[in-house]
């Protein structure tokens, strides 16, 4: 009986300690281990997530992410900036009296019906997209409903402003932002962001961000992933009005890194305007002192001719680095007749070998080489499940840390946490993959303890890492911009650039 009673007491105490452990995981591990061992019940259980693949991967990243030897001091960013009005896409469309019909992509939106069809199309795929709304009055009516929506939130928007805001979080960096900055945006910007007076305007540019969650339903429609649909009637950014202000500000600011974005905003313009403006973009970039790297951040596009012109009309050779996602990468290949261009869209997680082939083609056909007058030597690719940094050998350093840092910020920003909470993230990357689909690539099996995989192909180095995908993302907008900014922050360019 005494033996039974002692066993029962030990059992109850073990149960109690287990409950304490589950309910109060923040208690010091030493206190829990001491209590557990005093009961002589063997080794204490590991805290949640520590031994999981997600926990091991997060710990491995932390060990790999180190600042480069040579760091940026002054970063200039331009030229698109706006105020993002973020709210539930389904709730807004319901408030507008719309119902989900058959989804259909529209390269440009002209009506509420076009908006409903395009939103349904992309929500059904769980894919991000950005479209221009041509009707000024209809857009302002929708924008007013969205802005006054009880759950609507206002944030810094526009790739340039978001990238500048991310850089500004580092107090040892000085950040210049050129773009159409109205009163609301100026109020939202970090104090560390300097806006030249010529960039200030009386009225803000508003972009509407319609978000949806993974598994969210609207009648028969169900989103496979959390994502967003963006639309605007943005004339200032659409004309890249701040380009000349941006370039003229560089001489006084003396940056050692320039980040350019906003080319996609020209989709609502005429072909003649696009061609003329792109030539002016190239001329402006050529005025930037030699040795100052220029990163171009691409964004969602539907105009193949505009994308083809960006690729071929000297824009790619003029920049040093590119940032883009899976939609932009495939569209780029389709527009310029690159590899796998017959692929109409991605089916689920983009195939690593296919992505690698397209990145290799961009750098081989349009990148820096002895026989080509091009500065392009780096591409930072990001998709929901993984990231790849591809670089021409001999021009960039610390890319292992850079790709890991970009993936880490994707997890923390999506979940709105300071550090990775392993209970709120999961691995979505393929467990194994081929490094190429066109050549005899290697087969790679993921190891969470060594999360960055490196391979080489004819003078191009690839750094791959999976992403810890947030299960319940708080905000998806600006993730790509944060990823690119963080990757650049940890990158080092060789002086002979």
From Swiss-Prot:
<comment type="pathway">
    <text>Carbohydrate degradation; glycolysis.</text>
</comment>
<dbReference type="GO" id="GO:0005576">
    <property type="term" value="C:extracellular region"/>
</dbReference>
<feature type="domain" description="ADPK">
    <location>
        <begin position="52"/>
        <end position="497"/>
    </location>
</feature>
<comment type="similarity">
    <text>Belongs to the ADP-dependent glucokinase family.</text>
</comment>
<protein>
    <recommendedName>
        <fullName>ADP-dependent glucokinase</fullName>
        <ecNumber>2.7.1.147</ecNumber>
    </recommendedName>
</protein>
<dbReference type="GO" id="GO:0006006">
    <property type="term" value="P:glucose metabolic process"/>
</dbReference>
<feature type="signal peptide">
    <location>
        <begin position="1"/>
        <end position="22"/>
    </location>
</feature>
<feature type="active site" description="Proton acceptor">
    <location>
        <position position="481"/>
    </location>
</feature>
<keyword id="KW-0324">Glycolysis</keyword>
<feature type="binding site">
    <location>
        <position position="328"/>
    </location>
    <ligand>
        <name>Mg(2+)</name>
    </ligand>
</feature>
<dbReference type="InterPro" id="IPR007666">
    <property type="entry name" value="ADP_PFK/GK"/>
</dbReference>
<keyword id="KW-0808">Transferase</keyword>
<feature type="binding site">
    <location>
        <position position="297"/>
    </location>
    <ligand>
        <name>Mg(2+)</name>
    </ligand>
</feature>
<dbReference type="Pfam" id="PF04587">
    <property type="entry name" value="ADP_PFK_GK"/>
</dbReference>
<comment type="function">
    <text>Catalyzes the phosphorylation of D-glucose to D-glucose 6-phosphate using ADP as the phosphate donor. GDP and CDP can replace ADP, but with reduced efficiency.</text>
</comment>
<keyword id="KW-0732">Signal</keyword>
<dbReference type="GO" id="GO:0005783">
    <property type="term" value="C:endoplasmic reticulum"/>
</dbReference>
<keyword id="KW-0964">Secreted</keyword>
<keyword id="KW-0418">Kinase</keyword>
<keyword id="KW-0479">Metal-binding</keyword>
<comment type="subunit">
    <text>Monomer.</text>
</comment>
<dbReference type="GO" id="GO:0046872">
    <property type="term" value="F:metal ion binding"/>
</dbReference>
<keyword id="KW-0460">Magnesium</keyword>
<feature type="binding site">
    <location>
        <position position="481"/>
    </location>
    <ligand>
        <name>Mg(2+)</name>
    </ligand>
</feature>
<dbReference type="GO" id="GO:0043843">
    <property type="term" value="F:ADP-specific glucokinase activity"/>
</dbReference>
<dbReference type="GO" id="GO:0006096">
    <property type="term" value="P:glycolytic process"/>
</dbReference>
<dbReference type="InterPro" id="IPR029056">
    <property type="entry name" value="Ribokinase-like"/>
</dbReference>
């Amino acid at each position: 009986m005494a033996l039974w009673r002692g066993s029962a007491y030990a059992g109850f105490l073990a149960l109690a300690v287990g409950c304490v452990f589950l309910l109060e995981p923040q208690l010091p591990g030493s206190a829990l281990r001491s209590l557990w061992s005093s009961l002589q019940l063997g080794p204490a259980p590991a805290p949640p997530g520590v031994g999981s693949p997600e926990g091991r991967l997060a710990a491995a990243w932390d060990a790999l992410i180190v600042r480069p030897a040579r760091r940026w001091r002054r970063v200039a960013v331009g030229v698109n900036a706006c105020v993002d009005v973020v709210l539930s896409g389904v709730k807004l469309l319901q408030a507008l009296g719309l119902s989900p019909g058959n989804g259909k992509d529209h390269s440009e939106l002209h009506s509420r019906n076009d908006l409903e069809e395009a939103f349904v199309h992309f929500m059904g795929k769980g894919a991000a997209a950005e479209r221009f709304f041509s009707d000024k009055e209809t857009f302002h009516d929708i924008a007013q409903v969205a802005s006054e929506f009880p759950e609507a939130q206002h944030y810094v928007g526009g790739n340039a402003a978001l990238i500048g805001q991310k850089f500004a979080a580092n107090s040892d960096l000085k950040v210049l932002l050129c773009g159409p900055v109205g009163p609301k945006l100026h109020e939202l910007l970090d104090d560390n962001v300097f806006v030249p007076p010529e960039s200030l305007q009386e009225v803000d540019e508003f972009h509407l961000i319609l978000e949806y969650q993974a598994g969210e339903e609207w009648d028969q429609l169900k989103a496979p992933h959390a994502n967003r649909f963006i639309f605007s009637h943005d004339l200032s950014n659409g004309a890249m009005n701040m380009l000349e202000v941006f370039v003229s500000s560089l001489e006084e600011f003396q940056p050692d890194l320039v980040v350019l974005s906003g080319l996609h905003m020209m989709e609502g313009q005429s072909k003649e305007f696009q061609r003329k403006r792109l030539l002016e973009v190239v001329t402006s970039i050529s005025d930037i002192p030699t040795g100052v790297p220029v990163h171009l951040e691409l964004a969602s596009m539907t105009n193949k001719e505009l994308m083809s012109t960006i690729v071929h009309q000297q824009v790619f050779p003029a920049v040093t680095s590119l940032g883009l996602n899976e939609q932009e990468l495939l569209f780029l290949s389709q527009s310029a007749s690159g590899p796998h261009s017959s692929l109409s869209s991605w089916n689920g997680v983009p195939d690593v070998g296919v992505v690698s082939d397209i990145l290799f083609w961009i750098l081989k056909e349009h990148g820096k080489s002895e026989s080509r007058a091009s500065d392009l030597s780096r591409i930072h690719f990001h998709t929901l499940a993984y990231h790849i940094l591809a670089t021409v050998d001999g021009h960039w350093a610390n890319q292992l840390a850079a790709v890991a840092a970009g993936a880490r910020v994707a997890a923390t920003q999506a979940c709105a946490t300071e550090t990775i909470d392993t209970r709120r993230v999961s691995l979505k990357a393929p467990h194994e993959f081929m490094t190429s689909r066109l050549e005899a690539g290697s087969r790679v099996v993921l190891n969470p303890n060594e999360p960055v995989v490196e391979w080489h192909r004819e003078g191009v180095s690839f750094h791959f890492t999976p992403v810890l995908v947030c299960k319940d993302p708080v905000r998806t907008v600006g993730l790509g911009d944060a990823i690119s900014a963080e990757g650049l922050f940890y990158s080092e360019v060789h002086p002979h650039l």
